[in-house]
Amino acid sequence: MTEFSPDAAALRAALAALGPGRVWRPVHGPDGTLLAPGRGPGPECLDAYVAGLDVAGKTVADLGCNLGYFAFLAARNGACRVLGCDSDPEVAAAANLLARVHGVSNVAFTALDFLAAPAPERFDLALFVDFVGRGVVAKGRLAAVAAAAEAWARREAFFTLHPVYALEALAVPPDVLAARHPNCVRDGRFFVAEALAGLLGPEWSMRRLTDGRLDTGDASLRTKTALLFTRNT
């Protein structure tokens, strides 16, 4: 990365201001320099998340994008245009700096709470990478996620998530969970993928792209599943 570029200097300053707690995934400069390590697995694991996903020629929304690892990956894999959304304005600003430093013109970022704000348009594909987790389930936000998928995705919605949680892993009483998602609490477990499919309804078909697991070599990710929902009409 050219050290004398004003955008490069601004990006380094922005990443330093964010600190490691707000950078979820590795950030690299155009020359491959690691600018921020992120908190999770490396590229070899992350790229496996979307290995079975066809983005070529599609418009893509990366919702809950952080610094846009999957937004940039979608562009490299042939997406024609990508919009990344993150609720943190400083993160979105840093992601836009990153796009400029890389010279990527078909990826942009905006600060937006996509669970509350209306979608500016519908995209061919909406990505929800690692967005649905214990917090979303416990706070009763799964229905809002399904509504966001309906609003943002014209044709497809992609999720990576744990399809099943043990009830003791969730900070919500089982009866509350059962009231929210009938028939999805049984045998001491909550079936997240089933609940999401039920919320999206019969207009969508669900396909597991990873046959029930993300086999990335990282043991912490092996219970995650990549799901693709496709509109039937």
Regions found by a protein language model. Name each.
Residues 95-96:
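Conserved SAM-binding loop
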Residues 39-55:
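Conserved alpha-helix/loop element of class I SAM-dependent methyltransferases that forms part
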Residues 68-72:
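Glycine-rich SAM-binding Motif I of class I
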Residues 127:
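A conserved beta-strand element that flanks and buttresses the S-adenosyl-L-methionine
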Residues 103-114:
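Conserved SAM-binding strand-loop segment of SAM-dependent methyltransferases
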